[in-house]
Structures are given as C-alpha cells and as structure tokens.
C-alpha cells in the first residue's frame, strides 16, 4: 500500500482538528494526532502549533467563502442584485457551521502565543474578501463607497455570527438580514 500523499495527511489532520475544536477549545496536538490517526511526529512535520492549524482552517474557510461567492455572483443566470448579494453574504457568513471555529480563531489571535501571526493572516484574509465584496458592490451600485459598504457587511456578518453562536433570542437574525437586504442601497 502506498503512503498517503501529504495533502491527504494534512487534510486528515485539519478534519480531525475541526471536529475536536467544535467540541472544545482546550485540545492538545497529541489529541489531534490521535484523532487524525497520525503520529505526533507526522503532525509536527505539518503543524508546529495549534495556531498553524487554526490558520489553515481559517484559510480554508475564507477560500471556500470567496470561491462560493465568486461562483454565485459571476453566474449570469442568477439574480445577483444588491439585495440578493447582501442576503447571500449574511447567510453564508452568519449561519455557516464554522462559527465556533471562527470565534476560537479570534481568541487565538487576541490571546494565543502566535497572536501576531494569526492577526496578520486574518487581516489579509479579511482584506481579500473585502475587496471581492467591494468590487461586486460597486458593479451593482455605481458611485457607492464600496470600500466602506464592504467593511460594513463584514462587520455585521461577524457580529451576527457571534449572536447566532450565542443563540441570542432577543435578536431575530433572519429579520435583520431581510431588513439589511431591503435597505442596503440606502447606505450609499
């Protein structure tokens, strides 16, 4: 039997880490190695810290979100008007199963040993996604301040993701999303 490809091993490690991180925060590298069915040495070869694992998880999340958004918004057969773009961005960002993991990534960025590295990568990922949103907003709302509107969307998505993760029943997130979709053009 051939040895597994590095990409497969790395993905197995990430999949195991995601599952464990969704259950709790205090997961050791040894637990991740065991869950991924790899040796500690193999895990260390790919990841020297939990922070590196969190970063790759975050990178996968942002890449998937970006790729999905681009595939949707660039599909000429779809209605990708501003209300639909806003609704799509909120639904994908707020209700995605990665909410708990994203919050843990924020915690690592703020208080983890490698916080500076995580902050830099997170900021790069936010800037990349902001630029995608900005370009799509300006295409649909010529003359609008796409930069600020994209940041507004991202800040609101993160805030609603926190409220959704906390299961805050005092806010009707779906109603808020519909209100934003209907009124977003007024913010230009």
Identify the meaning behind each predicted range:
Residues 56, 70-96, 139, 149-153:
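Hydrophobic alpha-helical connector segments
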């Amino acid at each position: 039997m051939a040895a597994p490809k590095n990409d497969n091993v790395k993905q197995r490690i990430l999949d195991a880490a995601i599952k464990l991180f969704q259950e709790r925060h205090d997961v050791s590298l040894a637990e991740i190695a065991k869950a991924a069915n790899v040796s500690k040495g193999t895990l260390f070869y790919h990841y020297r810290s939990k922070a590196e694992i969190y970063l790759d998880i975050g990178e996968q999340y942002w890449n998937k979100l970006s790729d999905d958004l681009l595939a949707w918004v660039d599909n000429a057969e779809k209605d990708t008007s501003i209300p639909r773009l806003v609704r799509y961005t909120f639904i994908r960002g707020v209700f995605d199963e990665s909410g708990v993991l994203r919050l843990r990534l924020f915690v690592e960025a703020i208080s983890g040993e490698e916080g500076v590295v995580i902050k830099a990568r997170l900021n790069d990922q936010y800037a990349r996604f902001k630029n995608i949103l900005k370009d799509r907003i300006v295409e649909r709302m010529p003359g609008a301040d796409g930069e600020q509107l994209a940041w507004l969307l991202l800040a609101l998505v993160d805030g609603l993701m926190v409220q959704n993760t906390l299961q805050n029943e005092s806010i009707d997130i779906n109603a808020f999303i519909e209100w934003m979709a209907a009124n977003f053009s007024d913010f230009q």
